[in-house]
C-alpha cells in the first residue's frame, strides 16, 4: 500500500509541477482534500506535494486558474497563500508589468465578490483573506506605485453599499497594519512615509464615513463604518473629532440603538482617552450628553450586578464597555469635571455607576474598575501625603482639615473601601483554600492572575487607608464582629476580611496598628476555639497565620504577642489538615527573618533567650513535620542563630541546633567504618540526603559561622561522596546507563548533589578567601575532579561545574594556580557532552559556561597559560555558546566574549597574535547570529561587541596585518571582508545597500544605540526579501521598557508606607 501511495504522490507532484501544461484543477482539489480529510501517510504525501508546489517560483501564475475554477474553498485558500507568499517575499524582484497584473487581478476579484450582498455573507472568510492580500500589496505599492489608491477606494464605495461595506474593512485593516503593527515589519522610514500618506489623504476617507453615517439605512454597512472609524480614532488629526459633528452623531444617532451601542461606546471611549487641553468644552459636552443617554438606557437605580448575571452577551459587553468608558473618561478628565460646579452632579452619577459596575461578579470588569479606583486613591494621597487624618486618639473630631478634593470624594471612597474589603483577592502566602466542590484543601498551583489582582487591590486599599484609616478600621472591625457573632459567618467572608486586614500592614500609625491588631488576633484566636470541625479550624488557622506574617513591625514591638504567635505556629505544626503545616512553616520562616534579633536576646520577664527554649524542645516541635518542612524549620532557626553576635555563644547554639542531624550522621558514619556496604542500603542513603539538605538550609541562613559545623563533617562527607561515586560507577558498569534512573542510584546522586550544594553555599557566604583556599579547596578538588572526569556523561553531576564557578567567583586570584588542574578534569569531557547539539545536558551546558565566565572574569591570566590547542577549544566553546537557542546560554556566551575581547586588549604581549588568529573568525560568527532570526533578543549585546571590534580596527589598535597574504590597511581589508561575507550570504542585496551598511559600522561605532538601529534596519531589509516576520526585532526594547517601568514603580512604592509587602522591604529598613 505505501508503495502505491508513493507512486500516486509522485504522479500528482509531477503533473502539478509541470508548468508547460494546463493545471489539472480536479487533481489539485483531490490533493487538498487528502490534506484536510486524509489520515497518516496519505495526509503527509499531500502536505509534501502542496509544499513543493507552493515553493515553486512560478506557482503564483496558477493562482487565477485556482481561484476561478476550483470548487473547493480550501483549495482557494491555498491559492491565496501562494499569492501572499509572492507578495511578501518576491514582490521587489518581479517585473513591473507582472506586479500591475497581480494588483489588477486582486482588485477585480474583490470588487466582483463583494458587490453581491448574498456572496459577501456566504463567502465571508474568503473575502477576508482577499482583503488581507490587498493590504499586503498596498504595503509594497502605496503611495509610490499607486498614488490614487485612497481616491479609488472612496470613489468605488459610492457605487454599491455592499462594496462600500467591504471597502470599510479594507481601510480598517490598512489602518491596523500601518499604525498598530508596523514596528519592525517595515523600516522606520517606510512606516513614517505610510503614516504621513494616510494622514494627508484622510479627509476623503472621513467624508465617506460621514456620508454613510448620515445617509445610509443599511445597518451592516453602518456597523462596519463605525468599526472602521474606531480603528482610526487613535491617529487621525484631532480636528476631525472635535471640530465636526462626530461626537454628537455618535451619541444622539447611534448610542441608544442596541445594534450600534457597543461600537459607539467604544468610539466614545477612544475619544475620551485623548489628552489635550484645548478641547475642554467638547469633552464636557461628550460627558454630559453620554450621561443623559445612559440614564435613559440604564436608570441609576438599576441593580447592575443582577442585570449582568441575567444579561445576554451583547448586554454583558455593554456593561464591560461602560466600565471602560467611565474609567477612561474619569482618569483623563475627572479633574475637569470637579472644577465645574454645574457638572458635579453628573460626576457623582458617574461615580455611582462605577460603584454599581464594580459589584458585577466578573473579574475582567472588576479589574477595569479597580484601575480607576487605584488611580483616584493614589492621586488623592500623592496630592498631600501628610494630611492623612492624625491619630483619632489625638484629634477630637474625625474629619478635620481635610483637603477639598478628598472632601468631595469622601462618601464614595468609604463605599470603595467596603467593596475592597468584601472582594479582596487571595494573597500568594495563603495555601489553604476552598475548592470548587466546597472542600478545604491545600493549593498546589499558584494562580498568577489572582496574585496580580491581589497586588493591585492591596495597593488600592493601602492608599484608601492612608486617606482615612479611621473609616477603614471601622469597616474592618464591624465585619470582624459579624464573623464572631455569626451574622456574616462564612469561609469566603472570613477569608476576604482577613486578607484585607493583612494587606494594609504599614499603612497605619504604629499606635493605631497595635490597638487594632490586638483586637483582631484575640477575636480570631477566640473564633478558633469557638468553631468546631477540622475544615473551620483550618480556614481560621490559615487566616491567623497570614495576618501575623504580615505585621512584623507589630511583633517586633510586642514580645509577648510574638511569643504567643510563635507558640501558636508550633501548635499548628502538629495539625495534619492539608496545607496548615506548610503555612505554619512558611509563616515561621518569615517571622524569623524579620524578627531574628528578638529570639537571641533575653526579653523582659524571661529567664533565657527564646532560641534556647526552641532548641530545648526542637524534637517535640518538629516530630509531625515532613522532611521538606523540617528543612524550612531549620532554615528559620538558622536566621535567629545568625543574628547572635557573640561568637562563643553562637558556636554553642550551632552545636545544639545541629545535635539531632549530627547524631544520625555520626551513627551512619560509624556503621560505614565497620561495613561500607551500609552505603548501599536505600533507607540509609535517603537519610544521608535528608541530613545534608538540612545542613544546606541551615548554612544558607547562618552564613560564614556555619564553618564550625561544616568542618565537623567535611572530610567524612567527601569520603561518602567518593564511596557513593564508586557505587554508581560499578552499577553502571554492571547494568548499563539505564541504571541511573533507579531510585537507589538517584538517592545516591542526591547525596552527591547536596554535598556540592552545601560546599558551594558556604563558600559563597564565607568571608576568609585564604582560609577557604588553603583548607577546604584541596580535599574538595581531590574528591570531585577525577571522579567527574572518569564518570560516564550521564553520571556526571552538573553541580561540580557550578561549584567550581562559585569558588572561582569568590576566591578570584587565590585560585588561579588551580585553574589548569580544574580545566584538565572538567573542560574537554564536558565540551564533548554539549557540542553535538543544542539540547542535551541543559544543566551541564549552563554551568559549563558559568565556569568559563568566572575564569574569564577573575582568573584571566590562567587562560593565557593554557596550551594553544586548549585555548582554541575555549574560544570554540564560547562561539558555540552564543549560537545557542537556549537564551541564557547565548547571553552568557556573548558576555564571555565581550569580557574576553576587553581582557585581551589589556595584554599587550598576547593581543596581536590573538587578533591575527581569531579576529576575522569571531567577526564572521557574530554576523551569523546577528542575521539569524532566533537570536534577535541579543541585539544590544551583538551591537556592543561589533561596535567594539570595528572600533579596534578603526583606531589602529590592531597593528598586526589581519590578512598576512596581502598586508593592506586593516580597515580596508575588514570593509571588503564584511561586504563579501554579507553578499555571499544574501545575494539579493544591492551593492549600494551593503556599502552603506558597512560604512555605518565604522562611522557609528562610538554610539551604541545608533549602531543598533543601523543593524536593525539592515535586518529588516534582509527579512523583507526572505518574507519573514520582523516583529521580533523589537523584543529587547519591549523587555527593557517593561523592566524600567517595573523599577520606576518599585521606587514609587518604596516611598508610600504599606504599599510594599513587609517581606519585600530590604532587611536594613525593618529591624
Curated annotation (Swiss-Prot):
<feature type="repeat" description="HEAT 10">
    <location>
        <begin position="1002"/>
        <end position="1039"/>
    </location>
</feature>
<dbReference type="InterPro" id="IPR014877">
    <property type="entry name" value="XPO1_C_dom"/>
</dbReference>
<dbReference type="Pfam" id="PF08767">
    <property type="entry name" value="CRM1_C"/>
</dbReference>
<dbReference type="GO" id="GO:0031965">
    <property type="term" value="C:nuclear membrane"/>
</dbReference>
<dbReference type="GO" id="GO:0005829">
    <property type="term" value="C:cytosol"/>
</dbReference>
<dbReference type="GO" id="GO:0015030">
    <property type="term" value="C:Cajal body"/>
</dbReference>
<comment type="subunit">
    <text>Found in a U snRNA export complex with PHAX/RNUXA, NCBP1/CBP80, NCBP2/CBP20, RAN, XPO1 and m7G-capped RNA. Component of a nuclear export receptor complex composed of KPNB1, RAN, SNUPN and XPO1. Found in a trimeric export complex with SNUPN, RAN and XPO1. Found in a nuclear export complex with RANBP3 and RAN. Found in a 60S ribosomal subunit export complex with NMD3, RAN, XPO1. Interacts with DDX3X, NMD3, NUP42, NUP88, NUP214, RANBP3 and TERT. Interacts with NEMF (via its N-terminus). Interacts with the monomeric form of BIRC5/survivin deacetylated at 'Lys-129'.</text>
</comment>
<dbReference type="InterPro" id="IPR041123">
    <property type="entry name" value="CRM1_repeat"/>
</dbReference>
<feature type="domain" description="Importin N-terminal">
    <location>
        <begin position="46"/>
        <end position="112"/>
    </location>
</feature>
<dbReference type="GO" id="GO:1990904">
    <property type="term" value="C:ribonucleoprotein complex"/>
</dbReference>
<dbReference type="GO" id="GO:0010824">
    <property type="term" value="P:regulation of centrosome duplication"/>
</dbReference>
<dbReference type="GO" id="GO:0006406">
    <property type="term" value="P:mRNA export from nucleus"/>
</dbReference>
<dbReference type="GO" id="GO:0032434">
    <property type="term" value="P:regulation of proteasomal ubiquitin-dependent protein catabolic process"/>
</dbReference>
<dbReference type="InterPro" id="IPR016024">
    <property type="entry name" value="ARM-type_fold"/>
</dbReference>
<keyword id="KW-0677">Repeat</keyword>
<feature type="repeat" description="HEAT 4">
    <location>
        <begin position="515"/>
        <end position="553"/>
    </location>
</feature>
<feature type="region of interest" description="Necessary for interaction with Ran and nuclear export complex formation">
    <location>
        <begin position="327"/>
        <end position="450"/>
    </location>
</feature>
<dbReference type="GO" id="GO:0042176">
    <property type="term" value="P:regulation of protein catabolic process"/>
</dbReference>
<dbReference type="InterPro" id="IPR041235">
    <property type="entry name" value="Exp1_repeat_2"/>
</dbReference>
<feature type="repeat" description="HEAT 7">
    <location>
        <begin position="775"/>
        <end position="813"/>
    </location>
</feature>
<feature type="modified residue" description="Phosphoserine">
    <location>
        <position position="450"/>
    </location>
</feature>
<dbReference type="InterPro" id="IPR001494">
    <property type="entry name" value="Importin-beta_N"/>
</dbReference>
<dbReference type="GO" id="GO:0006611">
    <property type="term" value="P:protein export from nucleus"/>
</dbReference>
<dbReference type="GO" id="GO:0071401">
    <property type="term" value="P:cellular response to triglyceride"/>
</dbReference>
<feature type="modified residue" description="N6-acetyllysine">
    <location>
        <position position="693"/>
    </location>
</feature>
<dbReference type="Pfam" id="PF18787">
    <property type="entry name" value="CRM1_repeat_3"/>
</dbReference>
<dbReference type="InterPro" id="IPR011989">
    <property type="entry name" value="ARM-like"/>
</dbReference>
<dbReference type="GO" id="GO:0009410">
    <property type="term" value="P:response to xenobiotic stimulus"/>
</dbReference>
<dbReference type="GO" id="GO:0046825">
    <property type="term" value="P:regulation of protein export from nucleus"/>
</dbReference>
<dbReference type="GO" id="GO:0000122">
    <property type="term" value="P:negative regulation of transcription by RNA polymerase II"/>
</dbReference>
<dbReference type="Pfam" id="PF18777">
    <property type="entry name" value="CRM1_repeat"/>
</dbReference>
<feature type="modified residue" description="Phosphothreonine">
    <location>
        <position position="448"/>
    </location>
</feature>
<feature type="region of interest" description="Necessary for interaction with RANBP3">
    <location>
        <begin position="411"/>
        <end position="481"/>
    </location>
</feature>
<keyword id="KW-0694">RNA-binding</keyword>
<dbReference type="Pfam" id="PF03810">
    <property type="entry name" value="IBN_N"/>
</dbReference>
<feature type="modified residue" description="Phosphoserine">
    <location>
        <position position="1031"/>
    </location>
</feature>
<keyword id="KW-0597">Phosphoprotein</keyword>
<dbReference type="GO" id="GO:0005642">
    <property type="term" value="C:annulate lamellae"/>
</dbReference>
<dbReference type="InterPro" id="IPR045065">
    <property type="entry name" value="XPO1/5"/>
</dbReference>
<feature type="modified residue" description="Phosphotyrosine">
    <location>
        <position position="454"/>
    </location>
</feature>
<feature type="repeat" description="HEAT 2">
    <location>
        <begin position="241"/>
        <end position="277"/>
    </location>
</feature>
<dbReference type="GO" id="GO:1902075">
    <property type="term" value="P:cellular response to salt"/>
</dbReference>
Amino acid at each position: 500500500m505505501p508503495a502505491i501511495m508513493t507512486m500516486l504522490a509522485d504522479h500528482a507532484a509531477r503533473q502539478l509541477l509541470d508548468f508547460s501544461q494546463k493545471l489539472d484543477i480536479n487533481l489539485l482539489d483531490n490533493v487538498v482534500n487528502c490534506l484536510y480529510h486524509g489520515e497518516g501517510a496519505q495526509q503527509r504525501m499531500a502536505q509534501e506535494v502542496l509544499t513543493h508546489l507552493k515553493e515553486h517560483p512560478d506557482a503564483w501564475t496558477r493562482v487565477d486558474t485556482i481561484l476561478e475554477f476550483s470548487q473547493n474553498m480550501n483549495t482557494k485558500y491555498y491559492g491565496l497563500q501562494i499569492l501572499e507568499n509572492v507578495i511578501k517575499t518576491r514582490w521587489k524582484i518581479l517585473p513591473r508589468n507582472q506586479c500591475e497584473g497581480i494588483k489588477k487581478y486582486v482588485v477585480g476579484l474583490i470588487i466582483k465578490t463583494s458587490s453581491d450582498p448574498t456572496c459577501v455573507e456566504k463567502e465571508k472568510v474568503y473575502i477576508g483573506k482577499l482583503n488581507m492580500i490587498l493590504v499586503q500589496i498596498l504595503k509594497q505599492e502605496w503611495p509610490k506605485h499607486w498614488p490614487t489608491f485612497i481616491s479609488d477606494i472612496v470613489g468605488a464605495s459610492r457605487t454599491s453599499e455592499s462594496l462600500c461595506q467591504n471597502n470599510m474593512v479594507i481601510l480598517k485593516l490598512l489602518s491596523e497594519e500601518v499604525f498598530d503593527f508596523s514596528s519592525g515589519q517595515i523600516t522606520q522610514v517606510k512606516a513614517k512615509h505610510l503614516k504621513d500618506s494616510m494622514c494627508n489623504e484622510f479627509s476623503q476617507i472621513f467624508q465617506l464615513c460621514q456620508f454613510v453615517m448620515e445617509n445610509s439605512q443599511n445597518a451592516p454597512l453602518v456597523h462596519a463604518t463605525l468599526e472602521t472609524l474606531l480603528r482610526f480614532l487613535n491617529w487621525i488629526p484631532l480636528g476631525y473629532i472635535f471640530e465636526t459633528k462626530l461626537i454628537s452623531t455618535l451619541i444622539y444617532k447611534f448610542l441608544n440603538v442596541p445594534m450600534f451601542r457597543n461600537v459607539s461606546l467604544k468610539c466614545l471611549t477612544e475619544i475620551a482617552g485623548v489628552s489635550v487641553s484645548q478641547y475642554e468644552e467638547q469633552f464636557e459636552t461628550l460627558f454630559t450628553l453620554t450621561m443623559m443617554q445612559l440614564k435613559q438606557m440604564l436608570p441609576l437605580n438599576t441593580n447592575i450586578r443582577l442585570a449582568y448575571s441575567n444579561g445576554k452577551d451583547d448586554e454583558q459587553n455593554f456593561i464591560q464597555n461602560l466600565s471602560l468608558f467611565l474609567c477612561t473618561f474619569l482618569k483623563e478628565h475627572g479633574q475637569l469635571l470637579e472644577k465645574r460646579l454645574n457638572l458635579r452632579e453628573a460626576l457623582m452619577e458617574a461615580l455611582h455607576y462605577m460603584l454599581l459596575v464594580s459589584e458585577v461578579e466578573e473579574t475582567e470588569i472588576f479589574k477595569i474598575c479597580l484601575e480607576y479606583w487605584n488611580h483616584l486613591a493614589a492621586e488623592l494621597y500623592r496630592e498631600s501625603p501628610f494630611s492623612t487624618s492624625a491619630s483619632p486618639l489625638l484629634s477630637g473630631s474625625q474629619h478635620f482639615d481635610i483637603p477639598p478634593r478628598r472632601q468631595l470624594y469622601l462618601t464614595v471612597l468609604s463605599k470603595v473601601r467596603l467593596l475592597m474589603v468584601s472582594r479582596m483577592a487571595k494573597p500568594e502566602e495563603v495555601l489553604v483554600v476552598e475548592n470548587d466542590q466546597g472542600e478545604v484543601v491545600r493549593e498546589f498551583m499558584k494562580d498568577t492572575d489572582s496574585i496580580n489582582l491581589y497586588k493591585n487591590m492591596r495597593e488600592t486599599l493601602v492608599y484608601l487607608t492612608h486617606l482615612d484609616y479611621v473609616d477603614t478600621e471601622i469597616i474592618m472591625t464591624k465585619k470582624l464582629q459579624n464573623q464572631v457573632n455569626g451574622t456574616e459567618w462564612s469561609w469566603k467572608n472570613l477569608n476576604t476580611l482577613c486578607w484585607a486586614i493583612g494587606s494594609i500592614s504599614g499603612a497605619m500609625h504604629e499606635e493605631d496598628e497595635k490597638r487594632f491588631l490586638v483586637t483582631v488576633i484575640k477575636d480570631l484566636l477566640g473564633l478558633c476555639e469557638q468553631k468546631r470541625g477540622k475544615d473551620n479550624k483550618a480556614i481560621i488557622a490559615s487566616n491567623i497565620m497570614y495576618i501575623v506574617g504580615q505585621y512584623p513591625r507589630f511583633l517586633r514591638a510586642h514580645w509577648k504577642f510574638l511569643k504567643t504567635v510563635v507558640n501558636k505556629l508550633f501548635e499548628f505544626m502538629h495539625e495534619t489538615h492539608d496545607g496548615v503545616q506548610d503555612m505554619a512553616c512558611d509563616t515561621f520562616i518569615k517571622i524569623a527573618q524579620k524578627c531574628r534579633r528578638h529570639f537571641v536576646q533575653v526579653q523582659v520577664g524571661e529567664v533565657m533567650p527564646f532560641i534556647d527554649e526552641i532548641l530545648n524542645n526542637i524534637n517535640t516541635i518538629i516530630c509531625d513535620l515532613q522532611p521538606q518542612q523540617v528543612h524550612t524549620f531549620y532554615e528559620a532557626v538558622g536566621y535567629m542563630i545568625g543574628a547572635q553576635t557573640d561568637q562563643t555563644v553562637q558556636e554553642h547554639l550551632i552545636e545544639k541546633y545541629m545535635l539531632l542531624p549530627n547524631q544520625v550522621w555520626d551513627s551512619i558514619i560509624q556503621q560505614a567504618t565497620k561495613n561500607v556496604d551500609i552505603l548501599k542500603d536505600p533507607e540509609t542513603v535517603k537519610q544521608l540526603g535528608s541530613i545534608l539538605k538540612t545542613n544546606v538550609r541551615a548554612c544558607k541562613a547562618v552564613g560564614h559561622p556555619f564553618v564550625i559545623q561544616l568542618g565537623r563533617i567535611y572530610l567524612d562527607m567527601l569520603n561518602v561522596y567518593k564511596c557513593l561515586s564508586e557505587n554508581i560507577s560499578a552499577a553502571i558498569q554492571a547494568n548499563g546507563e539505564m541504571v541511573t534512573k533507579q531510585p537507589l542510584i538517584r538517592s545516591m546522586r542526591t547525596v552527591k548533589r547536596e554535598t556540592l550544594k552545601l560546599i558551594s553555599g558556604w563558600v559563597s557566604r564565607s568571608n576568609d578567601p585564604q582560609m577557604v583556599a588553603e583548607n577546604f579547596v584541596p580535599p574538595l578538588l581531590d574528591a570531585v575532579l577525577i571522579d567527574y572526569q572518569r564518570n560516564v556523561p550521564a553520571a556526571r553531576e552538573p553541580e561540580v561545574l557550578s561549584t567550581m564557578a562559585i569558588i572561582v567567583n569568590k576566591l578570584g586570584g587565590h585560585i588561579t594556580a588551580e585553574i589548569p588542574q580544574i580545566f584538565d578534569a572538567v573542560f574537554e569531557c564536558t565540551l564533548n557532552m554539549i557540542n553535538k547539539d543544542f539540547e542535551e545536558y541543559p544543566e551541564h551546558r549552563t554551568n559549563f559556561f558559568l565556569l568559563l565566565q568566572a575564569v574569564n572574569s577573575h582568573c584571566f591570566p590562567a587562560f593565557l597559560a593554557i596550551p594553544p590547542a586548549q585555548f582554541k577549544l575555549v574560544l570554540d566553546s564560547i562561539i558555540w555558546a552564543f549560537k545557542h537557542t537556549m537564551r541564557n546560554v547565548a547571553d552568557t556566551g556573548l558576555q564571555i566574549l565581550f569580557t574576553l575581547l576587553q581582557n585581551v586588549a589589556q595584554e599587550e604581549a598576547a593581543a596581536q597574535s590573538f587578533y591575527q588568529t581569531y579576529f576575522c573568525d569571531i567577526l564572521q560568527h557574530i554576523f551569523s547570529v546577528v542575521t539569524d532570526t532566533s537570536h534577535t533578543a541579543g541585539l544590544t549585546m551583538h551591537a556592543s561587541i561589533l561596535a567594539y571590534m570595528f572600533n579596534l580596527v578603526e583606531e589602529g589598535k590592531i597593528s598586526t596585518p589581519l590578512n598576512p597574504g596581502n598586508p593592506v590597511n586593516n580597515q580596508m581589508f575588514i570593509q571588503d571582508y564584511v561586504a563579501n561575507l554579507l553578499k555571499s550570504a544574501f545575494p539579493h542585496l544591492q551593492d549600494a545597500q551593503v556599502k552603506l551598511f558597512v560604512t555605518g559600522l565604522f562611522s557609528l561605532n562610538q554610539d551604541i544605540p545608533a549602531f543598533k538601529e543601523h543593524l536593525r534596519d539592515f535586518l529588516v531589509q534582509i527579512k523583507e526579501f526572505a518574507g519573514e516576520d520582523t516583529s521580533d526585532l523589537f523584543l529587547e526594547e519591549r523587555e527593557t521598557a517593561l523592566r524600567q517601568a517595573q523599577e520606576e514603580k518599585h521606587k514609587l512604592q518604596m516611598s508610600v508606607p504599606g504599599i510594599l509587602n513587609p517581606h519585600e522591604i530590604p532587611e536594613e529598613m525593618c529591624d
